[in-house]
From Swiss-Prot:
It comes from Photobacterium profundum (strain SS9). GO terms for biological process: cytochrome complex assembly. The keyword DNA repair does not apply. It is found in: Cell inner membrane. This is Cytochrome c-type biogenesis protein CcmE. Residues 30-161 are periplasmic.
Amino acid sequence: MNPRRKKRLTLAVALVFGLGATIGLMLYALSQNMDLFYTPTELVQGKPDGTKPEVGQRLRIGGMVVEGSVKRDPQSLIVTFEVADVGPAVTITYNGILPDLFREGQGIVAQGVLVNSTTIEAHEVLAKHDEEYMPPEIAEAMKKTHEPLQYSDEQKQGRVQ
């Protein structure tokens, strides 16, 4: 093989290797930043296709805060509460200041890590905007079960107990 062809071959191999490494790193970064959305029922029972998240997986969960479930640690900012849709409840632990619109009986979306099959350690909690707002993922999940949410008059008025 003459030197000119050898140089071209080396350059082509280096280019293909570099391009492959770049694409591999991009796919790895995207997979690390992907958070899958679950409802409490899907988290406990699994999605219709049979998939369930693994312990340690990052995810988003949305539902309604169960009334009487909010417990605050008086010594720190740690808050523990339960979120449910139409099925089982999931416990969420959050260390931080909750949004002003957060209250029992209202919709939230939490982003965090699955600690065990029914507990999530959240690093972000988002509250809904008003008494009629529901995140699209939660509304779609509720439609699938054909069970509409029943709001109390106090929830519709936005009063805190």
